[in-house]
Amino acid sequence: MSMNLIGITSPGVASAIAAAGGRLAGVETQSVEAAGLVALLFRSKDTSWQFLRRSRTALESMVRAQRILEAAAMFGPLLPARPGSLIRDDLEACTLLCGHSRQLAESLRLHGNTTQFQVTITWNPMAALAARRDHPDLAAAAAAGARGAAKEAGHLISRFMADERVAFEAEAMRALATVARDVIALPVDQADMLMNAAVLLAPGAEPDLEHALEALDGSLPGENRIRLIGPLPPVSFAAVSIDRPSRDRVAAARRLLGVREATERHDLRRAYLDIARAHHPDTGAHAAGAQAVGAAAEAFRLLARIAEARLCAEQGDVLLVDILRHDQHRSVST
């Protein structure tokens, strides 16, 4: 049975979790230590989230994962894994830690002490209109309604409310940016929601965030609700993302570069440069050459990373690791 990767932490934090009973949010965890780092894991029968889609099981898994992350963060620095990241066994966990120890340790140092909050702000549109009834645009809408021009009145009100939403969201994002290390705008998926964002905070910055939200609440007339979810480890800003390149994908990259399986990195680079030179504009290559060079560069990066990872994983699948933001996506071959 595969294990879910919670995140990467230090031996000290892992020991503290174990001393407290080894359970996070009621879930039994285990740890694998190697290269001065620890992979925190828990066993789960759930299928990976990418297959669960929008099912109720997926939602329950997401809520449970969030609670586990919240509980883990209470013990100390943690570099979270992208939700749904699976590790097959202890050996693969060791491969992950040993093969990417420098990258993981540096990311843990940079991001492990940061915290993430989700901020949502909703309003009552009718209360917002009532609080702004003296605004010139709404006065014009009232006048239009009084003379029977209901369509014009509705248009004026809709435009006013849309402008207010856009202006407030921009103001809110600016306010959050002044107190946060980073801000990611999240989808606004409810009719009464004005904004939805994830904010990354440095240690001790929570009071600054609270003050900024109080100021925003005061600037927005009507009935408003500000919801703050967290703290969490920085899962939207610095999540461990694991990739296992398929055989077909690797074979396609080798064919594109014209190299064999055991090709060294310097030979991979030479193969890529040969393609780049052949498609250089000075050689009279067509515009499509840029696309060919881009594909060759992607293939080179993939095969070079695999060659490096193979130094630590002589058996089993190769693991490629990136530390990604929520709004970042791994390229086709990296």
What label would you give each PLM region?
Residues 1-225, 231-245, 250, 320-334:
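An interfacial alpha-helical scaffold signature
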Residues 223, 238-287, 295-334:
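N-terminal J-domain/J-like co-chaperone modules of DnaJ/Hsp40 proteins
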